[in-house]
C-alpha cells in the first residue's frame, strides 16, 4: 500500500515538473517571438509597430517570416522526436529517411529547368511531391518486404545518399546564376518569405498539432516492437502513418526554407536531459522549443553581419554539429 502511494506521488511530482517546464518554455517562446518582431537592421519597438515604418517592416516583412520560422522549427523538431521513437534510434532526425533530399531533388530540377525563375508555388508543390514520393517508396518497401525499424532506417539512409548525389550532379551541370541560387537554397534560408507563402505555414500547423497529440502511441512504440504489439498497438498501421506524416512535414519545411539540419536531433535530446521523458509532454515541448530555437538561429543569421544574412542552415549546422558529435560519443549502443 505504501509503495503504491509512493509511485502515485512520484507520478504527480513528475507531472508538476513537466507542466512547470512547459510554462517556462511558453514564456521563452513568447519572449523570443516578441524579440524577432523587433529585431533587424532597424530595431522597431512595440510603440512604433503601427506606424508607417512598422506597418512595412513588422507586419509585411518580419511577421510572416517569424510565422514561417516557427512552423518549420516546430515541424523539424517534432519530426525528429517521432523518428527517434519510431526507429528506436537516439540519433534519428528528419533528414535520415532521405525525405529532405528527395524534396530537394525536385526543387533543384525545377530551378534548372526554368533557368532560376520558377514560381515559388511550383517549387513548393515540387518539394512536397518529392518528399511524398520518397515516403511512398519507403512505405512500399515496408508493406511488401515487412522491414523492421533498423532495415527501414538503412533504406532511408540509402535514399538520402542517392538523392544527395543526384542533386550534386545537377548543380555541377548548372549555369553560374542557377548555381548561386541553388547553393543558397540548399544551405537553408527564410529570406524572401512573405504573406504569399503562408499557405504552406497553414498546411504545417494541423500536422504539427496532430503529431503533438500522439504521445500515448509513441510511448508504447518507444518500448520496442515486441512490447508495443503486446499492448495492442498495430505496428504496421502506426509506423506507416507516422512515416507519411513526417515526410509531409519535412517536404513542406524544405519548400519553405530549404535544408536545415540538426535541429530535429539536438532539441529533443536537450529536452530529455531536462527530464521530459513522457511523449505526451515531450512533443508539445518540442513544438515550443523548436519554434523559439529556430527563431534564435534566425536572429543570429539576420544580425551577425551588416547588410547581409547568413543562411540559417549554416547557423544550425555550426551550433548542432558539436552536439551531434557529443551524442555520437555518448550513445555507445544504438544499433
UniProtKB/Swiss-Prot annotation:
It is a multi-pass membrane protein. One of its GO terms (cellular component) is plasma membrane. The chain crosses the membrane at residues 21-43, 63-82, 95-114, 119-141, 153-175, 195-212, 244-266, 281-303, 310-329. It comes from the Bacteria. InterPro entries: ABC_BtuC-like, ABC_transptr_BtuC, ABC_transptr_permease_BtuC. One of its GO terms (molecular function) is vitamin transmembrane transporter activity. Coiled coil: none annotated. Part of the ABC transporter complex BtuCDF involved in vitamin B12 import. Involved in the translocation of the substrate across the membrane. This is Vitamin B12 import system permease protein BtuC. It comes from Photorhabdus laumondii subsp. laumondii (strain DSM 15139 / CIP 105565 / TT01). The gene is btuC.
Amino acid at each position: 500500500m505504501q509503495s503504491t502511494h509512493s509511485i502515485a506521488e512520484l507520478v504527480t511530482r513528475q507531472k508538476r515538473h513537466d507542466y512547470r517546464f512547459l510554462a517556462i518554455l511558453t514564456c521563452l517562446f513568447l519572449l523570443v517571438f516578441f524579440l524577432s518582431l523587433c529585431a533587424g537592421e532597424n530595431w522597431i519597438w512595440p510603440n512604433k509597430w503601427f506606424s508607417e515604418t512598422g506597418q512595412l517592416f513588422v507586419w509585411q516583412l518580419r511577421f510572416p517570416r517569424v510565422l514561417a520560422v516557427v512552423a518549420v522549427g516546430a515541424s523539424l523538431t517534432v519530426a525528429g522526436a517521432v523518428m527517434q521513437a519510431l526507429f528506436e534510434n537516439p540519433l534519428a532526425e528528419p533528414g535520415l529517411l532521405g525525405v529532405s533530399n528527395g524534396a530537394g531533388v525536385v526543387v533543384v530540377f525545377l530551378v534548372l529547368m526554368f533557368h532560376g525563375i520558377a514560381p515559388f508555388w511550383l517549387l513548393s508543390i515540387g518539394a512536397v511531391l518529392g518528399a511524398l514520393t520518397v515516403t511512398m517508396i519507403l512505405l512500399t518497401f515496408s508493406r511488401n518486404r515487412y522491414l523492421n525499424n533498423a532495415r527501414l532506417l538503412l533504406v532511408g539512409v540509402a535514399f538520402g545518399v542517392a538523392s544527395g548525389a543526384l542533386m550534386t550532379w545537377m548543380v555541377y551541370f548548372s549555369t553560374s546564376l542557377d548555381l548561386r541560387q541553388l547553393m543558397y537554397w540548399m544551405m537553408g534560408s527564410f529570406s524572401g518569405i512573405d504573406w504569399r507563402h503562408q499557405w504552406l505555414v497553414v498546411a504545417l500547423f494541423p500536422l504539427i498539432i496532430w503529431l503533438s497529440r500522439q504521445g500515448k502511441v509513441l510511448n508504447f512504440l518507444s518500448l520496442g516492437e515486441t512490447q508495443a504489439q503486446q499492448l495492442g498497438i498495430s505496428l504496421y498501421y502506426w509506423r506507416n502513418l507516422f512515416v507519411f506524416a513526417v515526410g509531409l512535414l519535412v517536404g513542406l519545411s524544405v519548400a519553405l526554407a530549404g535544408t536545415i539540419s540538426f535541429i530535429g536531433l539536438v532539441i529533443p535530446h536537450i529536452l530529455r536531459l531536462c527530464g521530459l521523458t513522457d511523449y505526451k509532454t515531450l512533443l508539445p515541448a518540442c513544438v515550443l522549443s523548436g519554434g523559439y530555437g529556430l527563431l534564435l538561429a534566425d536572429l543570429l543569421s539576420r544580425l551577425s553581419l551588416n547588410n547581409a544574412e547568413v543562411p540559417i542552415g549554416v547557423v544550425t549546422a555550426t551550433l548542432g554539429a558539436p552536439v551531434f558529435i557529443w551524442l555520437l560519443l555518448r550513445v555507445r549502443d544504438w544499433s
